[in-house]
Amino acid sequence: MADLANEEKPAIAPPVFVFQKDKGQKSPAEQKNLSDSGEEPRGEAEAPHHGTGHPESAGEHALEPPAPAGASASTPPPPAPEAQLPPFPRELAGRSAGGSSPEGGEDSDREDGNYCPPVKRERTSSLTQFPPSQSEERSSGFRLKPPTLIHGQAPSAGLPSQKPKEQQRSVLRPAVLQAPQPKALSQTVPSSGTNGVSLPADCTGAVPAASPDTAAWRSPSEAADEVCALEEKEPQKNESSNASEEEACEKKDPATQQAFVFGQNLRDRVKLINESVDEADMENAGHPSADTPTATNYFLQYISSSLENSTNSADASSNKFVFGQNMSERVLSPPKLNEVSSDANRENAAAESGSESSSQEATPEKESLAESAAAYTKATARKCLLEKVEVITGEEAESNVLQMQCKLFVFDKTSQSWVERGRGLLRLNDMASTDDGTLQSRLVMRTQGSLRLILNTKLWAQMQIDKASEKSIRITAMDTEDQGVKVFLISASSKDTGQLYAALHHRILALRSRVEQEQEAKMPAPEPGAAPSNEEDDSDDDDVLAPSGATAAGAGDEGDGQTTGST
């Protein structure tokens, strides 16, 4: 055991020193020479049995202090003792060079005594899990590419670990939401798509196969080249390359995918694609950017195309029709407006030239809605304009004495009630007669607003007038409708009623006195010889004349009583 422990130290120390060197130090030819040694298949075959059966060797391996880095850099270890190692130390050396467990970190190559290769278990789990298992997929992929644990093809113990320290720890991380980089790498493509759909075989053909048998077919020089290329890449680049390779595989053979992935193959499903969208897709595919993936983000393309279509349609619709514009070109009735204006011009010959000029100015080729409306109203408004006519009422030769607002009622004999004729202006006019210069008076009443004549009567001596109440006067007058005498009632304010009654009573008394004077003038003068003829005849004449005088006196008393009562 002492000899075995002495031989372990030079075999285990080189991986520790070489791990701190530059990662791409070994050349492909040197790796090929190391992998062609004869005892490595046997040591690799014995690895599963000796890993758990020698805990003391693992303890010695864990407690062994590392050598200083300066010594390892100055004096590299000779490869001769490695060829003479027994199977157990060579197994430890190959295991430390090939890779460590994901939980190890920097001390993973020291704790390889209890190591059991979980290669197939992690690879099968990556097939069933969804995108959160990208870290496990990457770790399993990197473990397969350097052929260290596959059927004796492991290089010598001096080969450094092909995985970065960040990838040796299998820590679950959230999905990266950054846009994938345009750089395409064909080395790392997981065996499952982004949505859990299995990718076709030709897409994953560029990547090393997941089974140990297919990995054994590859030469060690190719494996070394891939190790050097993979060690130079960063983990973020690997993630972006995974996404870009998936997109490239989807481009190559989209028809082979049996499951549905949302947002893919929109060109085959949607029939609303224009040539502009196709050209935009070709330009995007020819000039990929870092923000948008190449020809896969169809939604942004459709949004931009819909915005362009909306702007184009808005421009086209704005050029087509605007409400209220060019009415003279669309409407078939403008000639009617011209006819109306011509008719108005015929009626008003004086304003003919001005109206024609205004109509021509108001109807240009392209006029606005307000202008056309103003022209229409101006053309139709001429119909309502009436010529100024001198008003003749027939009262021009008369002088107005009294004017008042009142209501006029007429008495209906059949119904024995008062019927209203209307409400308006009552005027009392005086007119000098041409014969002897006597006054002739009349009452004229017209309705308010329409000025319809509802009362027109002259004053005569036998006209009856009395004051029915403080605010009403009852008179007899001629009716204009049936040309007969009817009883009318004038209702007004108390002041106007008193003034009207006094004026009417004064004029009627003057007419009566005039009639009496005419009667006295017509009576013949008595002869002087016939006067003392007979007393009986005189007494008889006195008896006949007395009733007439009494009646006349009674009538005079009634008139005086009415005048005093009215005043």
UniProtKB/Swiss-Prot annotation:
Gene3D superfamilies per the record?
Answer: Pleckstrin-homology domain (PH domain)/Phosphotyrosine-binding domain (PTB)
Where is this chain compositionally biased, Pro residues type?
Answer: 75-89
The compartments listed are:
Cytoplasm; Nucleus
Q: Where is the composition biased (Acidic residues)?
A: 534-544
Report residue spans for region: Disordered: 1-263, 332-373, 515-567
Q: Name one GO cellular component term.
A: cytoplasm
Domain RanBD1 span(s) in chain numbering:
378-518
Q: What is this protein called?
A: Ran-binding protein 3
Q: Which organism is it from?
A: Homo sapiens (Human)
Encoding gene, per UniProt annotation:
RANBP3
